[in-house]
C-alpha cells in the first residue's frame, strides 16, 4: 500500500540559474515566487520510501506516471495499491495504472458525483465512524464510495463563507470606484474583475458579472448576480467526496479508512516545511536544491524511525 502526494516549496531570490525553479500553482500561497514541486511516497505508517523533485510548473497528474515508473525501477514490479487524491487521479492516470496492472484507491472530482446521484439516492447510509457515513456502488469491477463527514462539511462551509464575503466585498469596492468615476476604462474594469475571480475562485464561480459601457468605452457601473441553484447544489455537497477503487473485496469502511491515511503524506510535508525548514529555499542551483530536499527527507525518515522504535519499546 503506497500513499502518494505532491506539494510545492518556494524560493527566496531569482534562482535564474536553476532549471527547476518555475512559477506554478503554489500550495504556500506565494504565487510571486518561483518554486519546485516535491513528490513523496510514504507507507501507511508515514515512513518515506521515495521522493522526487520536479520543476515548479509541473502538474500533479502529469508527474504521477514518472513516480510509478521510478518506483518499479528501484524496487521491482509488484502488486501495489496506490492511494492518491483527486488532483493526481485523472482518467489518464487511472488507465495507466490499469495498463501496468497496478491497483488503486483514489479520490475523484466532485463533479463526478452528478453521474451517480440518481443511483446513490436509492442507497442507505452506513456509519463508519462518528459523524462519518458512506454509500457504495459497484460497477464494472470497480467500487465507488460516497462518504460524507460532518467535520469536513463545517470546514468547507466556513471556507466558502470566507470566500463569498471577500468576493462580495471586493466587488462592492470595485463598483464604488466605477460609480465615483475613479475607474472609467471598461476594459480595465473587466481586467480587475478577472483578478478578483483569481483571488476568490471558490466564490466567483457562482456569480456572473456585467460591466455595461457607454459609447466612449467607459464603464457605467458594475453589476453581478448569483446563481442560487448552483450555490444551493454546492451547499448540498459540502462534506461529501467520492472514492474509486478496484479493490472489490474491501468493505467500504476499509476503503474509507485507507484513503484517510493520505494524511500521513500531508503530515510529512507539514513537518518538513516547519521543523525541518524545507521552505523557503535559499539555494540558487538545482543540484543544491536536490541536496536540500534530500537532507530534509532523510531527516524526516530518521525521525519516523526513532518514533517507531520508541513506540514499540513502550
List PLM regions with ranges.
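Anion-binding and metal-coordination hotspots
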Residues: 1-314
Amino acid at each position: 500500500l503506497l500513499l502518494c502526494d505532491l506539494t510545492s516549496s518556494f524560493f527566496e531570490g531569482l534562482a535564474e540559474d536553476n532549471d527547476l525553479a518555475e512559477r506554478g500553482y503554489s500550495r504556500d500561497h506565494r504565487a510571486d515566487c518561483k518554486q519546485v514541486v516535491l513528490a513523496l511516497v510514504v507507507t501507511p505508517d508515514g515512513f518515506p520510501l521515495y521522493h522526487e523533485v520536479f520543476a515548479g510548473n509541473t502538474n500533479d497528474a502529469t508527474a504521477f506516471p514518472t513516480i510509478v515508473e521510478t518506483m518499479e525501477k528501484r524496487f521491482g514490479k509488484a502488486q501495489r495499491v496506490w492511494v492518491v487524491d483527486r488532483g493526481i487521479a485523472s482518467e489518464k492516470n487511472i488507465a495507466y495504472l490499469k495498463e501496468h496492472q497496478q491497483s488503486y484507491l483514489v479520490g475523484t472530482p466532485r463533479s463526478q458525483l452528478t453521474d451517480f446521484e440518481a443511483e446513490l439516492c436509492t442507497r442507505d447510509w452506513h456509519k463508519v465512524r462518528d459523524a462519518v457515513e458512506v454509500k457504495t456502488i459497484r460497477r464494472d469491477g470497480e467500487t465507488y464510495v460516497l462518504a460524507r463527514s460532518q467535520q469536513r462539511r463545517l470546514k468547507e462551509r466556513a471556507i466558502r463563507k470566507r470566500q463569498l464575503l471577500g468576493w462580495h466585498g471586493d466587488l462592492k469596492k470595485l463598483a464604488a470606484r466605477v460609480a465615483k468615476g475613479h475607474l472609467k476604462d471598461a476594459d480595465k474594469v473587466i481586467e480587475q474583475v478577472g483578478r478578483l475571480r483569481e483571488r476568490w475562485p471558490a466564490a466567483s464561480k457562482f456569480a456572473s458579472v456585467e460591466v455595461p459601457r457607454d459609447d466612449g468605452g467607459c464603464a457605467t457601473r458594475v453589476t453581478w448576480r448569483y446563481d442560487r441553484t448552483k450555490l444551493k447544489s454546492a451547499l448540498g455537497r459540502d462534506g461529501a467526496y467520492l472514492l474509486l477503487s478496484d479493490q472489490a473485496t474491501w468493505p467500504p469502511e476499509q476503503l474509507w479508512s485507507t484513503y484517510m491515511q493520505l494524511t500521513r503524506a500531508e503530515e510529512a510535508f507539514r513537518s518538513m516545511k516547519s521543523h525541518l525548514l524545507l521552505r523557503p529555499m535559499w539555494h540558487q542551483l538545482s543540484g543544491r536544491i536536490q541536496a536540500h530536499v534530500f537532507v530534509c527527507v532523510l531527516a524526516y525518515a530518521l525521525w519516523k524511525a526513532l518514533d517507531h522504535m520508541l513506540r514499540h519499546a513502550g
